[in-house]
């Protein structure tokens, strides 16, 4: 069995749209084109990747130096399993246009269930189940609201809050709201309610660290893959990751939390809770975003987001596992390109030991740079 990968970063926006015919904003199109080569790095040997117009010289060099065993997709072959960044009617349409038969693609009913599970309500349900399971108090769980009055009540209770659209991509649809400034934002929030039916509201935290637990769902079971420590700009716009072993990331997280006991308990309980909430309706990579915070009587916010899709955390976890020298560490950044496709590194046995490499090919509008210090 081989996988057919598709980088489709606009999938969260496509889920909000809810239809197969979706036109993403220009920035999302540029990001997709630039990142089309990412699965070449995280796919398994024998997998194929949908990426058009790949620079042949660049591809030969990264294959030779890093031992990539992935291939550029030409046409569908029996046994290929579609593996998009995320599932939606829009991502399924891309596979259909590439000749992938309907028999190996999810049905509209299955995709509607994935869309429902991708609603931020799922994070609320997982958070509530986790709060019931652990023998200690957790940060308040996000609330789903359907009126502006409910937003106002949450702001009165918590002070500053964050309002989130049910479906939105990194950094989009995340709106900070102050209790005394709600009227100014009322019109835009009412518009969001009309479009998506509800909003999620949670306290605005004094954040110390963003991190995530990485899983794979398969046949109703949830398996732990590793950890991710990442950086964001503003309210949630992703900028990069730490490249390090799971053990090193775990130590960094526990330092930010001031201990390991609660984090260990959350990691113990989460797989069973995720399996119970999601069941067999979704198979593939999954990430649970968390935060270390200061004040308010707790340090861990264990369920900020539940992402039923590939994440940059998974990309970095797999890149570190397969392409970074043992015991080394570094960073991964995503930025608008000022010279993409750079390969300025020392490698040994297919692994980078010093320097940096761009996972995007030359001429891309964005760079996805992994660097070992």
Regions found by a protein language model. Give the residues of each.
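Conserved N-proximal alpha/beta basic substrate-recognition cap immediately N-terminal to
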Residues: 28-42, 50-156
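Phosphate-binding site of ATP-dependent enzymes
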Residues: 159, 185-239, 292-303
């Amino acid at each position: 069995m081989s996988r057919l990968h598709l980088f489709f970063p606009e999938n969260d926006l496509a889920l909000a749209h809810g239809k197969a015919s979706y036109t993403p904003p220009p920035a999302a199109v540029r990001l997709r084109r630039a990142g089309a080569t990412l699965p070449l790095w995280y796919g398994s040997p024998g997998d194929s990747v949908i990426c058009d117009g790949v620079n042949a010289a660049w591809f030969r060099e990264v294959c030779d130096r890093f031992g990539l065993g992935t291939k550029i997709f030409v046409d569908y072959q029996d046994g290929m399993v579609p593996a998009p960044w995320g599932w939606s009617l829009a991502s399924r349409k891309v596979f259909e246009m590439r000749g992938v038969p309907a028999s190996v693609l999810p049905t509209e009913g299955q995709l509607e269930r994935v869309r429902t599970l991708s609603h931020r309500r799922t994070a609320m349900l997982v958070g509530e189940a986790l709060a019931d399971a652990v023998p200690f108090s957790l940060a308040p769980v996000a609330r789903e609201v359907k009126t502006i009055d409910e937003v106002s009540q949450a702001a009165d209770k918590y002070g500053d809050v964050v309002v989130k659209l049910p479906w939105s991509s990194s950094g989009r649809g995340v709106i900070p709201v102050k209790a005394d400034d709600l009227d100014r934002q009322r019109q835009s929030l009412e518009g969001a309610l009309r479009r998506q039916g509800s909003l999620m509201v949670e306290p605005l935290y004094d954040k110390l660290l963003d991190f995530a637990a990485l899983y794979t769902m398969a046949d109703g079971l949830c398996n732990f893959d590793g950890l991710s420590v990442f950086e964001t700009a503003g309210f949630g716009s992703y900028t990069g990751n730490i490249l390090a072993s799971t053990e090193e990331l775990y130590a960094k997280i526990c330092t930010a939390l001031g201990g390991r006991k609660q984090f260990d308990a959350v990691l113990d309980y989460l797989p069973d809770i995720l399996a119970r909430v999601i069941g067999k309706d979704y198979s593939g990579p999954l990430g649970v975003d968390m935060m270390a915070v200061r004040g308010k009587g707790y340090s861990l916010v264990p369920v900020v987001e539940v992402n039923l899709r590939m994440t940059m955390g998974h990309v970095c976890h797999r890149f570190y596992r397969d392409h970074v020298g043992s015991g080394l560490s570094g960073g991964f950044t995503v930025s608008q390109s000022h010279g993409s496709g750079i390969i300025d590194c020392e490698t040994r046995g297919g692994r980078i030991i010093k320097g940096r490499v761009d996972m995007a090919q030359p001429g891309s509008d964005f760079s996805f740079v992994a660097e070992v210090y």
